[in-house]
Structures are given as C-alpha cells and as structure tokens.
Amino acid sequence: MSINKNIARLRRAKSTRSHIRELGVARLSVLRTGQHLYAQVFTADGSKVIAAANTLQADVKDGLKNGKNSDAAVKVGKLIAERAKAAGIEKVAFDRSGYRYHGRIKALADAAREGGLQF
C-alpha cells in the first residue's frame, strides 16, 4: 500500500499535535514550503495565535537572498522568540508539523532557543 508523502507527514503531525494538546502548554508550529518558512505560537487550547513570523515579512527579508535557506530560518526563529516573549510566553512545545528535525526546521528551533524560548 503506497502512501502519499504529504499524507504521511500530516499523519505524523496529527499525532504530535494530540500529544502536545495533552501537555497544556503553548505550541510553536512550523510550516515549511519550497520558498518560505512560517512560524506561529498558539495558545494551549489552540484557539488563538499569540505570535507569528515568516520569511515574507520585511524585517526578515532584509539582507537575505531568498527565504528558503537556513539563514532565513535563523532570522524567523529569533523573531518568533522575541515576539512570544513580548506576549508573555516563555515555555512552548515545538510542533515540527511532521517534518524531519533537520536543516531549516532545526535552524529555526535552535534560534528560538537562543532567543529565550524553552522547549
């Protein structure tokens, strides 16, 4: 039985999100596309976005050739940490949305940790 790559990723993401929901902490969710990277911090119940950052924003785009490399992920990670801390969030659960913890996803997570978020 063959499974589409995206369907398998979404299945992994669904499982991860159910575990995070049981923890009852804010969730740092990441979406990776071919051209850009998006990060959002949701409330513990998932009903409201507390902070958001992505590679389309002007303050992230400055000094970058494109939004699809690890340098862009580092900028997004630092920015999301700064915005989450400004909103009063110190501790989050990292939701990698079924992506491998490698490359841009790892760079974003490491930058968010350096920015002061605790996973």
From Swiss-Prot:
Keywords on record: Ribonucleoprotein, Ribosomal protein, RNA-binding, rRNA-binding
The organism of origin for this protein: Xanthomonas oryzae pv. oryzae (strain KACC10331 / KXO85)
Record keyword Thylakoid present: no
GO BP term (any one): translation
Subunit structure: Part of the 50S ribosomal subunit; part of the 5S rRNA/L5/L18/L25 subcomplex. Contacts the 5S and 23S rRNAs.
Molecular functions per Gene Ontology: 5S rRNA binding; structural constituent of ribosome
Pfam family, one: Ribosomal_L18p
Protein name: Large ribosomal subunit protein uL18
Protein's job: This is one of the proteins that bind and probably mediate the attachment of the 5S RNA into the large ribosomal subunit, where it forms part of the central protuberance.
Gene3D superfamilies: 3.30.420.100
Keyword Ribonucleoprotein found: yes
InterPro entries: Ribosomal_uL18_bac-type, Ribosomal_uL18_bac/euk
Example of a GO cellular component annotation carried by this entry: cytosolic large ribosomal subunit
Family affiliation: Belongs to the universal ribosomal protein uL18 family.
